[in-house]
From Swiss-Prot:
Residues 1-22 form the signal peptide. It comes from Scolopendra morsitans. It is found in: Secreted. Expressed by the venom gland. This is U-scoloptoxin(13)-Sm1a. One of its GO terms (cellular component) is extracellular region. It comes from the Eukaryota.
Amino acid sequence: MAYICAXTLAFLLCVNTGIIQAEDKEYVSSEHMEFRESCIPQDGECDRMADACCPGLQCLGCNPLAAHDTGHCKCQ
């Protein structure tokens, strides 16, 4: 009985301290990589209504009030 309690305690300590990591983290990272591959890089043309710039960038440089504005900006 003591052996079962000790093994259960050891397992719980490993899970709580991160020695045994959850598989969900791996799934999130693959999802993140998929987004990174499909995002628009710096100085790439983007649409201000559908911002798809890579993380850390914003779709900037549009002026909706200007007559020559086409609605396309650059990821900066």
